[in-house]
Amino acid sequence: MADLEEGFALTAVPLGSGPDGPLGVEQSGKTDQFLVTDSGRTVILYKVSDQKPLGSWSVKQGQIITCPAVCNFQTGEYIVVHDNKVLRIWNNEDVNLDKVFKATLSAEVYRIHSIQGTEPLVLFKEGAVRGLEALLAEPQQKIETVISDEEVIKWTKFFMVFRHPVLIFITEKHGNYFVYVQKFNSRILSKYTLLLGQEEKCVIQSFSTSVGRKFISLMSLSSDGCVYETLIPIHPSEPEKNQRLVQSQLLKSVVSGSARNGVALAILDQDHIAVLGAPLPASKECLSVWNTKFQTLQTSKELPQGTSGQLWYYGENLFMLHGKFLTVVPFKCEVSSLAGALGKLKHSQDPGIHATPHFVNWETSQGCGLGSQNSEQSKRILRRRKVEVSVQPEVPASTQLLATIQKDSEKHIEVELRKFLATKRTPDFHTIIGDVIIGLLGRCKAEPSFYPCNCLMQLVQTHVLSYSLCPGLMEFALEKTDVQILQLCLQQFPDIPESVTCACLKVFLSIGDDTLQDTDINMESVSDYMDPVQDGEMEEQTAFLQNGFSPEEDNCDSCAQKLKEKPQAAADESTSCPVTPKRAALLNAVLHSAYSETFLLPHLKDIPAQHSTLFLQYLYFLYLKCSENATMTLPGTHPPTLSQIMDWICLLLDANFTVVVMIPEAKRLLLSLYKFVKSQISICSELNKIEVSFRELQKLNQEKNNRELYSIEVLELF
């Protein structure tokens, strides 16, 4: 017996897939998650048990997905093809498909297949097949033509036969059907001609397959409403020759013969099939389950909103498009027996308990028919357990690395870490890296002399970490005053607390120039706009800032007078950078970091006044550099933006103005900022006046044109 349970829609929003339905539904790396590809631009990852999407990815406007997205079970990544030739590979962390891995192929792709236990395969429209790894190694390799002219691929399936991958695809040419079977263990491609027999004028509308010990069972649903079965030998006697296959009728009139669309077929187990379609010409479309052994209808569910004629089957769930919604229909099938068919099979136990059958399935015992899916699954589990037992002594590389961290020397750890990072990344790679850093920091605290700086640098440069994955790393780097690691963390971590950001700023402003000179700092953000500064000049300038008081600049009026008397000298002084290039690169990392003003301001108040002044001078220098360009931007790679510079100037003044205003060397800077703000207000005011003038001129011009268009001349007659 079989039962169809109440179906449910995966989402409350209609699937934007058009009238033809989605391109496909494919299983993800987890049994409860599925990739749904619509016939437009979008791939959605759904979790069936929660009935909600976990992620969504779309190609650019103007591009179109041409084959269903699949999951690479070996890497956990997703693969899709758009515009027939462009292959994209991404994972859950990616957001924009336009920025993920891209490979443009030399031929049009029909389908990508991926199953557990082997690498994905790419089937081209001309019938050629390539493994994904070989194709990515040379995307523009020449693809041969396997099928003849005007042959079109109609259906394809990828499965494992005795642990070896087998691909089957069916083509059609002028009403004739051909079956190709590609076995990859022997590299043999077998071709068969499918003889339709009495139903030669009929069109095959749907295919489905199952695998037994000796044969591949190919079932087809024809336009006459009947289901036919064809047995394809797994080991053909003459694989190189074009052989013929004869169909035999399995079920009669399962759907209406007049149905031209909305028809599909799926094999559920050795005795049951699911059929999608209208059973009578005037009836609505239905989802029904048939018993092929006794040729009886087991259950049926009406679909009043119609369907697209697509049916997918995974585990105990059927997927189909009902109206505009992708719907999941759970089902249950019991093993067929004569007693069960006649209603005489006794069930003494509760319905939830699976009792041992009270009959013998002779076909399964003798191995003559198709092996049941459950028995094959148990055998696969048994074989897999044997394999797992045989490889159990092998310790994972991450576990070995964590053990090495606890006892070996720093040099040996660095070598082992380099080997580990060279291996293929797994889906949990970022958590493993976080565990490795936590292990290193734990040993650093236990052994004060142990500090593997190079190892920590390598781990941060993997670009998979965040502050929350290794919360103690930046605090430990602050203790060691390791500005190199702090700079990297500020550049890469998106979730650094404001207190840690301010602590980094204090270190960057207070560390000596001699220490920075011997430190390797990333200079990308300052290389194109920072003028080289002589050591003598910088020492003199630093000394001036540290002395903190100059009698010549005792009062504010004299500063303003000097600004009026010597504008050129003031300009020269402002355009010289107040910090060394390496310190500037560190400060730029702070400018790029994310923050919230509410949480940042209290910590900025703890920065010493002299350091705040130095930072303000550097920010003002950056603003002047921006003003030199018409675009108001700094040259180079990842320089600070004008908005970042202005925001930090405002933040520093809000937090420290009452303290900074009391420092003598800050007077000229504050006056310069005052003059700058005043000039900006003046410029804005003048621009507003110009805008008003232009509007008035435009208004007068419009009135003049209107008078010319609608003027009437009056002539006085005597």
UniProtKB/Swiss-Prot annotation:
Keywords: Activator, Methylation, Nucleus, Ribosome biogenesis, rRNA processing, Transcription, Transcription regulation. Ribosome biogenesis factor. May be required for both optimal rDNA transcription and small subunit (SSU) pre-rRNA processing at sites A', A0, 1 and 2b. This is Nucleolar protein 11. Transmembrane segments: none annotated. Pfam families: Nol11_C, NOL11_N. Its main location: nucleus. It comes from the Eukaryota. Coiled coil: none annotated. One of its GO terms (cellular component) is nucleolus. GO terms for biological process: maturation of SSU-rRNA; positive regulation of transcription of nucleolar large rRNA by RNA polymerase I. It comes from Bos taurus. The gene is NOL11. It is found in: Nucleus, Nucleolus. The modification N6-methyllysine is found at K346. Interacts with UTP4. Interacts with FBL/fibrillarin in a transcription-dependent manner. May associate with the proposed t-UTP subcomplex of the SSU processome containing at least UTP4, WDR43, HEATR1, UTP15, WDR75.
